């Protein structure tokens, strides 16, 4: 039965968006595809897969029998996503640009573009669900816990979710692959893209070095002993083990080194040994004002919080402050990282989230006081 509703699918050239488009066409929707160009290829020494992905998108849309258009949002991406990505790194943060890309590009630039050309809905291959049974659309986890992407969509409003379709949210990745194989889609065996979209196959630090250069400082142990030098705090994140470059220090060979603190004033990088070191754990965190999927006026909320993609959610208490919120975890969490997002859940219901401003840790505060490092406690 033909459905008169027009749906525009974001086609990336991967298996997920391919199956998304196929399922909607099979359901009778009037389906068209749009390939989004969000990144410019002009940056030096950077390998980009846009041309290959577009060729795959064209081929799979031909197979499915839907038209494919191109839309160039690279200017929006540069101004609203990438510039902030670089400035956050310069401030010693560890940003997650994919979250901002969803908010600013896929559910702003792309959504506006599609509505302007007559779409009733947009659709993407994200593994999430939307519940439209109430007065406002709710964002729910996808049923496949290994692929759930609600963490990345927590800044999308209920108003915009109501205009969005996510058919893969009810499927596992294995089922999606099988649908692609059963229909002989050319993307059925294509590997999933991993990591940040614009970095592609490039090494993370090599990529950002093209834009940020070097800002060297010293590497210290927790007592303040100098162990080496680094090229810039922006190349490290809290809890990081690989790439510190401290192998073979005499008398300290027994355990791996982990990043425990980045001091932006002195440019010192403090590292500790052992993944269970107290300086790596936090009792909670401070976040900016929460971006709620739907309006929430509670000053306190018992919830679950997820502090990185695919990490286990932890029970927590969210408390409103004069400037943002405080989150207290039910148990200490490893590598709570400023710049990353703390996303708030009630079961499968994703309520919203915010960027982590700072950690809450009595062990860290005592150590910082002894070392003379500044930190902020919000009230």
PLM region descriptions:
Residues 1-154, 165, 174, 259, ...:
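ATP-dependent adenylation/nucleotidyltransferase module used to activate substrates
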């Amino acid at each position: 039965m033909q459905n008169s509703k027009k749906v525009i699918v974001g086609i990336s050239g991967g298996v997920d968006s391919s199956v998304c488009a196929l399922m909607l066409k099979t359901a009778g929707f009037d389906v068209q595809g749009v390939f989004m160009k969000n990144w410019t290829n002009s940056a030096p020494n950077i390998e980009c897969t846009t041309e290959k992905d577009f060729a795959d998108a064209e081929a799979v849309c031909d197979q499915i029998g839907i038209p494919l258009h191109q839309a160039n949002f690279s200017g929006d991406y540069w101004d609203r996503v990438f510039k902030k990505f670089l400035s956050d790194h310069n401030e010693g943060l560890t940003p997650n640009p994919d979250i901002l890309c969803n908010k600013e590009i896929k559910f702003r630039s792309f959504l506006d573009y599609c509505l302007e050309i007559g779409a009733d809905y947009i659709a993407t291959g994200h593994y999430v669900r939307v519940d439209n049974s109430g007065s406002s659309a709710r964002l729910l986890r996808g049923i496949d816990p290994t692929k759930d992407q609600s963490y990345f969509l927590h800044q999308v409003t209920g108003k915009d979710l109501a205009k969005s379709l996510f058919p893969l949210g009810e499927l596992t990745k294995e089922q999606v692959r099988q649908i692609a194989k059963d229909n002989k889609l050319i993307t059925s065996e294509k590997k999933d893209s991993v990591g940040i979209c614009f970095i592609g196959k490039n090494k993370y630090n090599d990529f950002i070095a093209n834009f940020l250069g070097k800002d060297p400082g010293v590497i210290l142990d927790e007592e303040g002993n100098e162990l080496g030098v680094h090229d810039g705090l922006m190349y490290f994140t809290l809890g990081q083990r690989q790439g510190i470059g401290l192998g073979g220090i005499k008398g300290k060979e027994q355990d791996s080194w982990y990043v425990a603190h980045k001091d932006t004033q002195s440019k010192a990088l403090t590292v500790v040994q052992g993944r269970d070191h107290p300086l790596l754990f936090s009792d909670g965190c401070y976040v900016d004002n929460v971006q709620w999927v739907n309006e929430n006026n509670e000053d306190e909320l018992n919830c679950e919080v997820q502090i990185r993609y695919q990490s286990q959610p932890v029970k927590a208490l969210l408390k409103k402050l004069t400037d943002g919120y405080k989150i207290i975890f039910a148990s200490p969490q490893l590598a709570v990282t400023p710049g990353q997002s703390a996303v708030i859940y009630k079961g499968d219901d994703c309520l919203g989230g915010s960027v982590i401003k700072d950690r809450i840790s009595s062990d860290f505060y005592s150590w910082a006081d002894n070392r003379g490092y500044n930190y902020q406690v919000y009230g």
